[in-house]
Structure formats: structure tokens, C-alpha cells
């Protein structure tokens, strides 16, 4: 049996702790994969635009499973968009806004969106992971295809917030 595809996660797997990789070595390995007919796939919860920034030379040759599977692109062409309906998006946002301990990033195809009112520390972290990020006054009337939400909250609150979100919106999304 021969290898047909190699898929890698980025953070903590393909990338070093400094969010880099040995490009020269990888490009040599990639050329070997191509010669053997092996597809290379980047799979990550990260934004598509961040992922392609790591592979500018070959972004239109490889596949990306971005946004935790919400957006799949192969050889520069959309394969899948896990679009939330407008009603589902609104329901989720309305619920998340009732939780002041949660800072929200709405992840869309054109951009990610977060609120202007959030503090600079949160914005700095968000900018590391979202190459396209817009600051908005609210989440009303955003025109985009939305895949998921990124949430920022303190680690000790995660179990209780996750449980509460599952109960409140688990029929729409898996928290």
C-alpha cells in the first residue's frame, strides 16, 4: 500500500513554538511528495488566510482544511463551506452576548470579526491567529459566510461555560 496523502496540523505539530518551520527542508520534501503523487493537506482550526501565509509558494497546489473543517480549499478552489444559517448565527451570537466572561470572534469566509470594545490583550492574541480581522461595534448585519466562533475566556471557566453552551446552543453547534 502506498501513501496517497499527508495531512498535518499546524500549531504544536508542524510549526515550532515560534510559529515557524524549516521552509527549505520542507520544500525539498514537498517536491519529493509531488514526484510520488502524494497530496499535502494542511488541517487546522486556524483561519484559511493565516494558513496560506505559511505556504505562499504552493498555496494553489495543496489543500487546506481550515476553521476546524468549516472551510475546505483544494488547489485554490473551494471544496466545502460549512455555512451557518443567518438564524443560527444570530441565535448563537445572542446567547454568547449574555455571557460577559466570553469574548467572541465570529469566523467568516471573508474575515473574522470581533468587538471594538474588547481589551488590547485580547486583540493582540486574536491578531496572531486571524490575518483578516475586523473590529466591529456589534455583530448585527455582517455580510459573510460564517463557519464557527472563536471564544476567549479564562481557563478555569472553560468547563462550566462549555457545559452551559452545550445546553443552550448544542443543537446548532458543538461548543
Segments and roles (model prediction):
Residues 1-2, 59:
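Short, small/polar residue-rich loop motifs at catalytic or cofactor-binding pockets
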Residues 11-21, 89-90, 124-128:
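An N-terminal domain-start capping segment
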Residues 95, 101-103, 107-175:
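Conserved acidic, metal-coordinating active-site core of Asp-based
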Residues 8, 71-74, 140-144:
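Short, basic/glycine-rich phosphate-binding loops at helix/coil junctions
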Residues 16-17, 79-80, 148:
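Short, contiguous strand/loop micro-motifs
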Residues 2-19, 44:
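Asp-based phosphoryl-transfer active-site loop
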Residues 24-122:
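Active-site phosphate-binding/coordination module
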